[in-house]
Amino acid sequence: MRTSPAYPDRRTAFWVPVAIAALLLGGCDRDRPTDIAAEIARIRAIDNHAHPVRVVGPGEQDREFDALPVDNMEPASDPVYLRPGAPGTLEARRTLFGQLGKPRVTQQKGDGYPAWVLDQMGVDVMLANRVQMGRGIEPPRFRWVPYVDALLFPLNNSKLAARNSDRRAFFADEETLLRRYLKDAGLAASPASLDDYLTGVVTPTLERQKQGGAVAEKFEAAYLRPLDFDKVDRSAAARVYSQFRAKGAPPDDQYKILQDYLFRYIAGECGRLGMAVHIHTMAGAGSYFDVEGANPLRLESVLNDPGLRKTKFVMLHGGWPFIGEITALLEKPNAWLDFSAQSLMLPPATLAHNLRQWLEWVPEKVLFGTDAYPYSDEMGWEESGWLAARRGREALALALTAMMRDGEISHDRALELARMVLHENARKLYGL
């Protein structure tokens, strides 16, 4: 992992004397956590999920880092690691920017600043979950993951938006994004029929994004509704669309029929186009978030749909707190997960426990991720990404060390697993 010249890699400084002590004590092959930590620190990672901010000029602002920014919601009890003055935040800033400070470094690096941040994180490629790519957020270091939730809600959303203040803000954002997609399709409003909506808006939007470099499409639907997307006949969905397209808000049960059909249609199109499907599966931000609605088990019927077996589903954030449930889903041939966000919000020892379960079950389906995000002025995407990368590596070292200590794997296998999680699994999944 590359670091600022003025601030050496502190993990290396810590682990080297521990390694010497372990060797002097004559530890056996399975009791060498120091070797694993040092190797992990050197592996250039693929970050499966993050929200980098583009380079902006004087007076400019970037709000396309998220389709549903979570910085304007009602107050909630934030996790300890996201609070002002959280452990590690000051260290991250000092390590990244030293005495020069963030504004000066940002100015010096110019358009190369985002790629420089990746170097400090030890990341080779970052999957950028953004509405649109932008200045400095470009291939090959950054790969695009746009949003498709807006396509699920082409009707009157006033009833859904009236649930609470978070939903009101979120549906306003989704409707703005849908208008953008309609404009890109040469339309001012949704077409008259579902068939026309699919062929004139949904599929062309996905194809344009694929041509624009997208490697996956992102659903953050758990912020808007539960994740149980049932299998629906096209005719039933078409009736709902036609009945309510120009009328008031549809009843919830009727609108769900259309949303469910659209989700599976989009997922199928992603499979056809060679794009993965990313889905938020974790307790999310805000005081109104439906935690149970984000249980990854709600996705089982989607994963079991024979028509969607060519689509690769990546369950983001590792399903926390439903760790056992998401572990079982890894047996599905079209299911993967990453541990983004957990790598930032959980202590390494806690995350290590989750990682060990996945590594003992289906290790080739586990992906490294940070969820780097501009949470605040104090913790931007740079600081959160650096912290999550470090904690994620520490957790991986702890998990692999415990597995070696218990005789489950050899030292060589531990190194192989580390390379898989940090790089190889994602490389194979996306063909990078």
Spans of model-derived segments:
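Alpha-helical scaffold segments that flank or form the walls of functional sites
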Residues: 41, 60-146, 151-155, 164-189, ...
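Hydrophobic faces of well-ordered beta-strands that scaffold small-molecule active sites
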Residues: 46-50, 125-128, 143-148, 217-219, ...
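H/E-rich (His + Asp/Glu) clusters that bind or coordinate divalent metals
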Residues: 294-298, 303-314, 318-432
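Mid-to-C-terminal alpha-helical segments outside catalytic/metal-binding sites
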Residues: 32-48, 60-62, 66-109, 363-365, ...
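Histidine/acidic residue-rich metal-binding segments in metalloenzymes
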Residues: 194-219, 226-335, 349-367
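A solvent-exposed, charged loop/short amphipathic helix patch at secondary-structure junctions
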Residues: 167-187, 232-253, 393-401
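Bacterial N-terminal signal peptides that target proteins for export
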Residues: 2-16
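C-terminal motif of bacterial Sec signal peptides marking the signal peptidase cleavage site
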Residues: 25-27
